[in-house]
Amino acid sequence: MVELKMGDHNVEATTWDPGDSKDWSVPIKPLTEKWKLVPAFLQVKGLVKQHIDSFNHFINVDIKKIVKANELVTSGADPLFYLKYLDVRVGKPDIDDGFNITKATTPHECRLRDTTYSAPITVDIEYTRGTQRIKRNNLLIGRMPLMLRCSNCALTGKSEFELSKLNECPLDPGGYFVVRGQEKVILIQEQLSWNKMLTEDFNGVVQCQVTSSTHEKKSRTLVLSKHGKYYLKHNSMTDDIPIVVIFKALGVVSDQEIQSLIGIDSKSQNRFGASLIDAYNLKVFTQQRALEYMGSKLVVKRFQSATTKTPSEEARELLLTTILAHVPVDNFNLQMKAIYVSMMVRRVMAAELDKTLFDDRDYYGNKRLELAGSLLSMMFEDLFKRMNWELKTIADKNIPKVKAAQFDVVKHMRAAQITAGLESAISSGNWTIKRFKMERAGVTQVLSRLSYISALGMMTRVNSQFEKTRKVSGPRSLQPSQWGMLCPSDTPEGEACGLVKNLALMTHITTEVEERPVMIVAFNAGVEDIREVSGNPINNPNVFLVFINGNVLGLTLNHKHLVRNLRYMRRKGRMGSYVSVHTSYTQRCIYIHTDGGRLCRPYVIVENRRPLVKQHHLDELNRGIRKFDDFLLDGLIEYLDVNEENDSFIAWNEDQIEDRTTHLEIEPFTLLGVCAGLVPYPHHNQSPRNTYQCAMGKQAMGMIGYNQKNRIDSLMYNLVYPHAPMVKSKTIELTNFDKLPAGQNATVAVMSYSGYDIEDALILNKASIDRGYGRCLVYKNSKCTVKRYANQTFDRIMGPMKDALTNKVIFKHDVLDTDGIVAPGEQVQNKQIMINKEMPAVTSMNPLQGQSAQVPYTAVPISYKGPEPSYIERVMVSANAEEDFLIKILLRQTRIPEIGDKFSSRHGQKGVTGLIVEQEDMPFNDFGICPDMIMNPHGFPSRMTVGKTLELLGGKAGLLEGKFHYGTAFGGSKVEDIQAELERHGFNYVGKDFFYSGITGTPLEAYIYSGPVYYQKLKHMVQDKMHARARGPKAVLTRQPTQGRSREGGLRLGEMERDCLISYGASMLIMERLMISSDAFEVDVCRTCGRMAYCSWCHFCQSSANVSKISMPYACKLLFQELTSMNVVPKMILENY
């Protein structure tokens, strides 16, 4: 019994002694308040913490490793010269304020001043100057953009009061960068796992591929089967190399040894025989001959290196460094690579015999997620190597020159290079790393600040590297392996459907941990080193191979014992808590993973049919004595990744625990992500409705943070009076949505009222709107810089201009202050000027001698454009990083709901306002309550949003009881309890009320279902979309009306509309639309030759006798002229009608 206490995961071992003292028939008492573990988890991990953990790992650990790996710079010109990096540090955020003054800065200041929130990267170096050896400390080599809330950030460890002093919202999650004043997020990137064998059928060819990835190299190696023979394929070789040649090149020369690595059973011998004969036919018998054969198949390099190597040396170099780059080679011993290749061959053989052994690319255990830390470390490594290479070339060039001063390498270290590289990568989102041939676009995006939830939802977004245009269902479909790791509802509709995903609530993404300690534990637990055994035991059916991060570690005879011991050590805290151990019985392998980018989540451990977390542990958590990490250290909870979940039996709740159960889910609602967690009773809705709400919840306006009044964003929507929802969910409280809500509780009557509510349109009560329902503020900004130029001229801002006759300020300049900038509080109309800026006509000439007063200036004013007037909220004058004056103006508009504005409930039920009715005409119930909104009942049956009806009931009961009801997923308040509460307060238990018509005053014939529902006002407002045109600007080239609302464009009558008019035979209408109202043009045509004439003169006929005037569209005339220029001459034949 003692050994079983160690947390056994195996089904066979869980047989119990019938004389055991415990009685299994006694049901397990459910733990109360087990969900309190979720907020405890979210304090330390989850949501945005993975971005921050990853970045912290980079600036504290990875950056030191990168500098250590490239610590020495030497020069071929002078053997005594060297530059050695001793240490590297990332400092605290600061900003250069000119005159060599640097001061500490805050993210808010960087947002306002359009600068980058970054910290200096400093190094300690030792180098030689001539014959001296010099040490320098704290030398700046560049600036690192800092992630908000990382370990070096100014906000870390501050209390709410201190954060408010820094103008920062305490609920802001952090995890993004501020680059040139813009908030940028590095999205989580989904990749196929590295260093892992994947067997697949590629156009009928069975192949096993490995993508090796180390710090130095990335390469892809394939073993494939063609015509009954096996080959190895790699990009650096022109042709597939027979596998036996590879074995011989790797030093396994005898055919018997090769066969014993593959397997000595008759099946393996029969399948592998043809490959052995193939090598015999090629006359390859020795390692040297194999290397020469490989050398003849190498791809010719474009740049020949200075030291020319023979083809066989090139081939050996390739085998050592590039093919299977992740398999370690000690001292030119290639045995491990030979063993690895033999395993790949065996995988291909097995898959040929049994088609079920193909690996699934879309299985989520085969994926890794790249976070900001790993992407930035690749970028930094590339820039750092480039800087060192440049220093080396400068040294090579300058040391041989005879100079008065000796060569000093410090003078050539340019900090701007690394700074600009990191900044431009984050601000443009283009990650280009030449060494890995990596070119990615769209890695970063601007943080969406429509609402608090849209910002949070963006931090948990996972971006796939798959092309969006291909209509493939595999990568898009919901995989069973994504259970609990990714949100099943939160994905966009359209082309990105299923490719852009979101993390679930309790998902954690691992960061890399050192594998050395785990290897020592594994060897102590009974793993034998594979290098010390021959090929035969490897193929023994009782022997299991042990892999660590894709590399072969060794083999074991007692795999259950090994797995049990490793898990026991992990639970006792002797090993990292994110190390995963899982068994694959089909491949006879045990995989240990310590790498970063795996998805995992915490589970309660179950032993002997009892969860290890007891009620007294939860009470300690409640009292604040116990933290989430204590549960991990005491071995009560552990993290499982996608692969290890396959080895476990996980119960949904306490009732489902059986004999073989190994783990218990902490809380079912953590299956959903942030956006889907806002929906009350999502398990009562049809699935796509929850998906629609996830998309619309991000467009709902509300509050974006406590500091929203101090921000100057390019576009910001604020709801004037947001409510916390009456029906909450646990996720709403965990994500602080109730503190920064986006919506209002509207009293809704579900009934038909006039014809203005068909197709989901809503009818609003005018009195409610007058009291402030759905009212919002829209903030926009305008900005300009005032620069000084190289020729000593500069921009200037002029005061307002006066009319010469009346001596009054002209209308355009009416809102300007005397300094030429608009004053706060003014109302600005369309085309009025806000900043009266002028710019010198010449900025790039030589400095002007004594004539700076006569420089001609051109006016480049910043004016207001918009159909409705705005108010100036604030004007800010500052300076940005380039020492230019920066002026920002914040404009405010108050929008009142009008017909055509879009609203939606939290169940994917969207609709526009169809009619606004006076309160006198609205129906009212016998308590005198008048609804804010009337919704058509036809929105319910086909949509099956039962969650909405439950929300209405719960909200109504909550109002009467004075409490919030919970509509948490897979739980929440029970309908029976809600109905009992309604009955207790004298209301009908099904939520229907007795209503009177507001128009006639008589009772309505049916009872009306009514109560409060949480409605969101969406950003789509009719004022921003409404567009019509009678006359306006035309395009220069075609003389047709311009296109688009912003350019006052026309509405195009397209090909389909034209076809429709042709089918009606409305020829005069076609002519009026397509020519007269668009681009009619009179042109002269010669009746003799059919060409166009000019001024009644035909140039071709040299005559004006037969020239007529006709009308045609200008675009048609242009087409004829363009064709003529290409030697295609259209001729027009004219007839009289």
UniProtKB/Swiss-Prot annotation:
It is an enzyme of class 2 (transferase). It is found in: Nucleus. DNA-dependent RNA polymerase catalyzes the transcription of DNA into RNA using the four ribonucleoside triphosphates as substrates. Second largest core component of RNA polymerase III which synthesizes small RNAs, such as 5S rRNA and tRNAs. Proposed to contribute to the polymerase catalytic activity and forms the polymerase active center together with the largest subunit. Pol III is composed of mobile elements and Polr3B is part of the core element with the central large cleft and probably a clamp element that moves to open and close the cleft. Its EC number is 2.7.7.6. Zn(2+) binds at C1086, C1089, C1098, C1101. Keywords: DNA-directed RNA polymerase, Metal-binding, Nucleotidyltransferase, Nucleus, Transcription, Transferase, Zinc, Zinc-finger. One of its GO terms (cellular component) is RNA polymerase III complex. This is DNA-directed RNA polymerase III subunit RPC2.
